Amino acid sequence: MAPARVCSLLLSRPAVPGRSNVHRRLRAPLLALPLAASLQAAGSEPVSAQGLDSLAAVRAVAADTLDGCARISQVFVDNHAVFDPTDSDLDPRFAWAYGFANRLHIPTREGVIRREILFREGQCYSPELLLDSERLLRNTTFIADADIYGIRQPDGTYHVIVDTSDEWSTRLEPRVDPRGGGLSGLELREDNLLGTGQHVAAFWGQQYDETVYGAAYATPQFLGTLLDAELAVAKTANGTLFAQSLSYPFRGEAGRWAWRQRVEHEDRYFEYFTPGEDKLVRVLFPERRRAMDVGGVFRLGRRGNLTLLGAALAGEWIIYPGGARFADEEDAVEGTVPLLLQRPTAFDTVSSLRVVFLAGQRSVYFVRRSALDAVRGTEDVRLGVEAEVALGRSLQAFSSDDDLSLNLGVDVAGELPGGLLSGARVLLEGKRDYGAPVETWEWRNVFGQADAWAYWRPSPESRHTVVGAVTAAGGWRTTVPFQLTLGNRSGLRGLPRNAATGARRAVFSLEDRFYIGWPYPQLFDLGGVAFVDVGRSWAGGYVFGTDPEFFASVGVGLRTAFPPGSRRTYRLDVAVPVAGGGGLSDFVVSVGVGQAIGRVLRDDPQIRRSSRRTLSASLFNYPN
């Protein structure tokens, strides 16, 4: 192999938008310059002692490749700072800022990166494992970008270059009260403690006129292993929180086994909105929830067509200690005190221990796209089909209910003509009560959630991305505390969180996201957005439900990411209602991390607080 061929391999991979890659490809040869020199010597010298050595090497390779694979002889890790000083695209005017940021940031340790990749020296060279390893690294909170490629050697083996860039890992994130726009809390987090990939965080805030605070710790490499560990402790508005988990997730598409153990204790308020004299009034019912699960999943099949089978033991214990109270003192007047007597049914003690059987089918592939949910960065997008089912039978000796839980989930996504990306997800769960009276409906606590999304970008160079999303949620035949609200927490960003209540809800959103590229694109990414949200709720016969007309809101916002090309996006939105009541003076300000709508689908928090959903197979996929 000639030296020109080596340079061709080093420069052949495509550039990643938002990051300069050519200089990295030119730095990688610093590791391979001795290799190029040896190639020149091997190519120009006649067969002699050196030639005999080469012949011996070929014979050694032949022996090594009898099993049909070429080996990896060397793995080089080349990790770059948040701002790479050799990047010619950086603005020299901000050299002081780049240097200051790099000095504040501790680089990721090489051993941390090596543990995340799926291959080692001496193993077979597999392009698929290289691609999976790239996604694993990019999926972490401390790596902004990863590029892995191999260089074939004269002896038939491969040198593999792992080229990574660190993510800025220290964050101070404010929490804004959507009702008044004031500061309601702060969170300080470090996602790469001392370059080890460990996450630590502390937060403080106000909730229901009570001071809350806590701390969290997480690591993807517990005690130097491939185990994920998480721990969180907090003071809540009416008690304490403790959560701990230890898991071994599927690593890429080649992983066969995954398991998880988790325990949780949480004191919280279940918040109801009830009709007052001229508005909806918040009433709080104290709830204490404890849960545990331990289980494992096995995958069989080939990449792109995987079947998942698993089992778990899951338990949940819920009590409702103490009496209800108003969230706002001004509501505690003589005319509204009787509202506290409207205690919803089903605030009964729950004790459940069940065996859960899991099954699923995963037929997915990944593509890379730019400026979808990131301002300008490149993201991994999962396409294909994934379906799952979980059946959980209660153990009567340890449970207050005799039932069977059923959970179904389907997730599809694909590319359509014209540069359109779209997808949808449906979740459905319920329980069959074997102790239900004769001639009554046995299925109860049926909850459903459906989400659909679409992205359209006129061209890869366009500064605009149009995003549409539809979300719907509902509950049927509920015997547990349950209520949905329609407002800014559910997607209508120009409304207060308690605009309407009910048992069903649907929201449609449309956004035009655009990259501004000003004032300092070499220092941070800045983009804007214009959006419209339309939605309504349905009472569904619910005692605390309303049945209003459609609501609508419009707004604008800013999106920013630091450093340029980062996938972590911060957003600031200002929205006003245009239908269903209110006016320009009733604007709502919201601040958050990540986009408000899109393909990053989340479980509806108001469904989850009422649901007794057991484990699902998708929880073990990483990255999912």
How would you describe each model-predicted region?
Residues 29-40:
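Bacterial N-terminal signal peptides
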Residues 46-190, 201-205, 210-219, 232-243, ...:
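Periplasmic polypeptide-binding modules associated with outer-membrane biogenesis and secretion
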Residues 69-73, 158, 168-170, 182, ...:
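Outer-envelope beta-barrel architecture signal
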